[in-house]
Amino acid sequence: MSQPVQRAAARSFLQKYINKETLKYIFTTHFWGPVSNFGIPIAAIYDLKKDPTLISGPMTFALVTYSGVFMKYALSVSPKNYLLFGCHLINETAQLAQGYRFLKYTYFTTDEEKKALDKEWKEKEKTGKQ
């Protein structure tokens, strides 16, 4: 690409994405709240690989409820906060998966299967693989 074309492309990009409105949005809680809140779904996704005995049923239920409420809130405020909605949608999905794992292990796994799973998780813990 020639230099004038590169300059024109850069100028176009800057005018479109780096303007007063974008900067104004980036410096608001509408942006930084959801960005900082992404730690919860990231942790939930990471925990999907961990031992199901570590899952807290009440906490998982609380986080499912919390994410559901805030998804509704994100679409109820004006202007709609799609970043917050996306954060809680990801968290809702991860927490529902954790809830499934909790219910499956706690209520639908026989004692023999639990012993085998516990042995498997202890082996993984020893080798450091998860």
UniProtKB/Swiss-Prot annotation:
- Where does it localize? Mitochondrion; Mitochondrion inner membrane
Q: How does it assemble?
A: The functional 150 kDa pyruvate import complex is a heteromer of MPC1 and either MPC2 or MPC3.
- Designated name of the protein: Mitochondrial pyruvate carrier 1
Q: How does it sit in the membrane?
A: Multi-pass membrane protein
Q: Could you tell me the keywords of this UniProt record?
A: Membrane, Mitochondrion, Mitochondrion inner membrane, Transmembrane, Transmembrane helix, Transport
Lineage per the UniProt record: Eukaryota, Fungi, Dikarya, Ascomycota, Saccharomycotina
- List residues traversing the bilayer: 23-45, 55-77
| Misc. remarks from the entry | Present with 396 molecules/cell in log phase SD medium.
Q: Name one GO cellular component term.
A: mitochondrion
Instruction: Please state what is observed when this gene is inactivated.
Output: Grows more slowly in amino acid-free medium (SD).
Q: Which organism is it from?
A: Saccharomyces cerevisiae (strain ATCC 204508 / S288c) (Baker's yeast)
